[in-house]
């Protein structure tokens, strides 16, 4: 399933030296600043390192975030704000807005932005792993878990940290509610795709598969609706992907619902359900073409070329043919003019984000270390403050070549 998932670019950031020569009055503060600089550099490097795995990413992220906590919370009292929170300006681009960054002189902004990139890394890791030629069951579980972890990070940022920013996120930027909600919902939907593929492979009841597909389609529809008020120039490509996935999984729901109806001797209704699946599958095919032609951030996924996509077309056709034959020989039922209403509720397999918390403050942050930062010696002329409108060099992400499609789904 290489290139089955749409991915927006990673956020890019300006370098941060953590050099406060005049303010630092002792070795503990110097060590913290040196460690912060190297931990940040290391974490940024790992975002584009194809050999990086979740354990390596978690360790590197925890190290940086534990050090950064001393710039956010007071040592020994996490309810109090650190005196260092506003001494450093941070610049980050947004996933849909090109190379012109947002800038805030606030360590909370850095925590959120870097955390956002960690979540994006988990989604990209899941996409790469799902694209392996012969994915194992353990790898499929890791895809599933990585997407749930990403959803949990996005959710935690939205609920616990973005509200703490003094400067609210601008419209269309990553940290505003519409975008972060869309990322959360997309992660949940993609994790449920893994569940559906598994349920199909294990030949679970058609009713369960139909319900899971319907719930997944509803997730994609909700994510698309969340982005509907954004500028089309920024969101059109992403929304095409969400729309095509919504059509694809609604077609899946109608296909498997048709099988359930046939098993209940409701052949006429089954035929109508399969006809609806056929129509929606054709719509998904057309949307794949439109998606490929739509300009926007991120590389173009190629869902219509996958066996997982094409298998549905064959399944719909064969099941519809079977229903029509059975109706001609056995049932002789009238085919309804209206497609059946899908009021399906899955009782199993629904995805919830994995709860996330940032690590506690590093043990390097002692009262002595904090005291070694003397804000009275801070330069009065803050001429080093970067201008928000200056462009930040984009992250050069590795190009993932599609592997041979063997038809193995993430299962």
UniProtKB/Swiss-Prot annotation:
Membrane-topology annotation of the record: Lipid-anchor
Lipid-conjugated positions (S-farnesyl cysteine): 408
Basic and acidic residues composition-biased segments: 376-404
Propeptide stretch(es), residue numbers: 409-411
Keyword Membrane recorded: yes
SMART domains reported in the protein's UniProt record: BRO1 (SM01041)
Cysteine methyl ester PTM positions: 408
Pfam families: BRO1
Modification after translation, per record: Farnesylation is required for nuclear envelope localization.
Keyword set, alphabetical order: Lipoprotein, Membrane, Methylation, Nucleus, Prenylation
Main location: nucleus
InterPro entries in alphabetical order: BRO1_dom (IPR004328), BRO1_sf (IPR038499), BROX (IPR038898)
Subunit structure: Monomer. Interacts with CHMP4B. Interacts with CHMP5: this interaction allows the recruitment of BROX to cellular membranes. Interacts with SYN2; this interaction promotes SYN2 ubiquitination and facilitates the relaxation of mechanical stress imposed by compressive actin fibers at the rupture site.
Function (record text): Nuclear envelope-associated factor that is involved in the nuclear envelope ruptures during interphase (NERDI) repair, where it is locally recruited by CHMP5 and reduces cytoskeletal stress through its action on SYN2 to help reseal the ruptured membrane.
Protein's name according to its UniProt entry: BRO1 domain-containing protein BROX
Species annotation: Rattus norvegicus (Rat)
């Amino acid at each position: 399933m290489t290139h089955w998932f749409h991915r927006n670019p990673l956020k890019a950031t300006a370098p941060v030296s953590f050099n406060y020569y005049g303010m630092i009055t002792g070795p503990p503060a110097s060590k913290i600043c040196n460690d912060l600089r190297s931990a940040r550099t290391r974490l940024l490097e790992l975002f584009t390192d194809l050999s990086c795995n979740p354990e390596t990413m978690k360790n590197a992220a925890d190290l940086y975030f534990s050090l950064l906590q001393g710039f956010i919370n007071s040592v020994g009292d996490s309810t109090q704000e650190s005196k260092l929170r506003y001494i450093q300006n941070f610049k980050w681009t947004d996933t849909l807005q090109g190379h012109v960054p947002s800038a805030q002189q606030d360590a909370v902004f850095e925590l959120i932005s870097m955390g956002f990139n960690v979540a994006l890394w988990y989604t990209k890791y899941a996409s790469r792993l799902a694209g392996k030629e012969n994915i194992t069951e353990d790898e499929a579980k890791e895809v599933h878990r990585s997407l749930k972890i990403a959803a949990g990070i996005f959710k935690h940022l939205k609920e616990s940290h973005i509200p703490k920013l003094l400067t609210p996120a601008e419209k269309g930027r990553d940290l505003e509610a519409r975008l972060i909600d869309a990322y959360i919902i997309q992660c949940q939907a993609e994790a449920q795709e893994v569940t559906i593929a598994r349920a199909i492979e294990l030949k679970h009841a058609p009713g369960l598969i139909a319900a899971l597909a319907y719930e997944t389609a509803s997730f994609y529809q909700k994510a698309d609706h969340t982005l509907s008020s954004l500028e089309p120039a920024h969101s059109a490509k992403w929304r095409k992907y969400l729309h095509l996935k919504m059509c694809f999984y609604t077609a899946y729901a109608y296909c498997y619902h048709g099988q359930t109806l046939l098993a209940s001797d409701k052949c006429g209704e089954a035929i109508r359900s399969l006809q609806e699946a056929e129509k929606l599958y054709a719509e998904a095919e057309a949307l794949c073409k439109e998606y490929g032609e739509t300009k926007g951030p991120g590389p173009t996924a190629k869902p219509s070329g996958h066996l997982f996509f094409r298998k549905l077309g064959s399944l719909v056709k064969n099941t519809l043919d079977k229903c029509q034959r059975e109706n001609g020989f056995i049932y002789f039922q009238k085919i309804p003019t209206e497609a059946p209403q899908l009021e399906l509720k899955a009782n199993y397999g629904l995805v919830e984000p994995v709860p996330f918390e940032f690590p506690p403050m590093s043990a390097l942050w002692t009262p002595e270390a904090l005291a070694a930062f003397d804000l009275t010696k801070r330069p009065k002329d803050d001429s080093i403050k970067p201008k928000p409108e200056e462009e930040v060099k984009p992250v050069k992400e590795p190009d993932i070549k599609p592997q041979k499609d063997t038809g193995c789904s993430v299962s």
